[in-house]
């Protein structure tokens, strides 16, 4: 426990907060190029083939990013936009690819939560 005099002289050290997505370097999104697109399996007790991509960002950092939604058009050398946000059952995946921007297409036939998946508003039925 410091004395008042010691606090006047030195002050207290502020704890530096650790960011959940360090590769973004305080930017909301970053652009990158896919170096590998593949599927991986989640932790127990879940079971699936989750689509992920290894992405080299514009700041030369390479990260693993999740491809959300059903179906995608990504392959090696596709240019993608990355945002923060981890996938709880995939260890080491701390970023999401933004659907509907740059080379990434939006999810086809998506009706709900469209803005999260880059899907356009569906046309109303003609017979109305």
From Swiss-Prot:
GO MF: rRNA binding; structural constituent of ribosome; tRNA binding
PTM annotation (3-methylthioaspartic acid): residues: 89
Short name of any one Pfam family annotated for the protein: Ribosom_S12_S23
Region (Disordered): 1-25, 101-128
Gene3D superfamilies in the record: Nucleic acid-binding proteins
Alphabetical list of SUPFAM superfamilies matching this protein: Nucleic acid-binding proteins
Segments passing through the bilayer: none
PANTHER family per UniProt: 30S RIBOSOMAL PROTEIN S12 FAMILY MEMBER
Protein's name in the database: Small ribosomal subunit protein uS12
Species of the source: Chlorobium phaeobacteroides (strain BS1)
Organism placement in taxonomy: Bacteria, Pseudomonadati, Chlorobiota, Chlorobiia, Chlorobiales
